[in-house]
Curated annotation (Swiss-Prot):
The gene is frr. Coiled coil: none annotated. Gene3D superfamilies: 3.30.1360.40, Ribosome-recycling factor (1.10.132.20). CDD domains: RRF (cd00520). This is Ribosome-recycling factor. GO terms for biological process: translational termination.
Amino acid sequence: MDEILLIAEQQMEDTVVAWQEHIKTIRTGRASATMLDKVMVNYYGTPTPVNQTAQISTPEPQLLVIKPWDKTLIQEVVAAINKSDLNLNPVSDAEVVRINIPALTEEIRKDLVKKMNKELENFKVRIRNIRRDSIDTAKKDKSISEDVVKGIETDIQKLTDSSIKQLDEISKVKEKELMAI
């Protein structure tokens, strides 16, 4: 019984952490190295995250500087950023790749919030699926009485509500960050 709750709680916590990591990559109009976490470069034939092949710094609030450890990767980094859905325009020279982060228009901000809320719903569905699977597991276990199953359902629902509330709170903070000028 406790095992079912512990597994559900861990899976829900993992989902909340995954959401936190996911929204770090959403552009806010300020330069952030985490923006490039999902950008992959072809490093000797292997897709590798940019942050594992280069030093990424933010010398100014609207500027990202990427300094690949292997200078031959500069064009690969530029190509990978151009292919990404970040809508950034990298400029390269012999040593580094510079990316000026343009200020977000209100229309783009609203679109980003809309996109974030759509993705948020997918994470909420994950939480609900964990709830459903955990309750099904408890019901299928013949060694657990009906009263105990009802108690497990109540506890799992509390975990579900708490996890969804956390997702919403994280999203509200990001939305404020996105809508701030």
